[in-house]
Curated annotation (Swiss-Prot):
Domain writeup: Avian ovomucoid consists of three homologous, tandem Kazal family inhibitory domains.
Limits of the Kazal-like domain: 4-54
Keyword Repeat: yes
Species for this entry: Aepypodius arfakianus (Wattled brush turkey)
Protein name per UniProt: Ovomucoid
Listed GO MF terms: serine-type endopeptidase inhibitor activity
Major place of residence: secreted
UniProt keyword list: Disulfide bond, Glycoprotein, Protease inhibitor, Repeat, Secreted, Serine protease inhibitor
Glycan attachment points: 43
Domain of life: Eukaryota
Site entry (Reactive bond 3), positions: 16-17
Subcellular location(s) of the protein: Secreted
SMART domains in alphabetical order: KAZAL
Amino acid sequence: VVIVDCSDYPTHGCTLELKPICGSDNQTYSNKCGFCNAVAQSNGTLTLSHFGKC
């Protein structure tokens, strides 16, 4: 299981950096910050599927 540490990311104001992450919801997030915001909104139910586009 791969885990992303979301403690370094704000709940808003992500950069436009493109480093895609595929979530367990089969949605591609543009970077760790965007993914971490989605994790927070899902109350922790969203997990990392893999790095890169889904």
